[in-house]
Amino acid sequence: MVYFENHNKEPDLAEIHYIPHNVEETHWFLDEIEASNFKWAFNVAHGHLVPEGWSGFLDTFGVDKIGQVRVNDNSGEYEIHLIPGEGTIDFPWLFERVESSGYQGWYNLGFGNQTDKIRIRNWFETLITE
């Protein structure tokens, strides 16, 4: 399986500029590549950094091509892998949107240490089952 991630925009003076970082650039790939082993690694925190927000990605692409949801938090200002709840992403709304859209895949926890991941996983489980 190949997982394709929406990235974060780097500052203009950065040495590297990733694509795709917004909805428009993500279309270039998700609309053109039709392969059963090509899935979208939906990075919620990266989506939180663009004007469309992470919900703009879901509004545009839905969940059908998602192979995994990558989860961490940030303030919406710049890329940093905060523990969920330490930034400004609305995780109850995120899980409501993703799960009610029919997503049945897995979530990748990209933050903190093992203890943090277990604690936050337990919190996320309560959000999904409410």
List where the protein language model places each region:
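Glycine/proline-rich, flexible active-site/cofactor-binding loop segments
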Residues: 1-5
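Active-site-proximal beta-alpha loop/turn segments in soluble metabolic enzymes
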Residues: 6-17
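Histidine-acidic metal/acid-base catalytic patches
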Residues: 14, 20-130
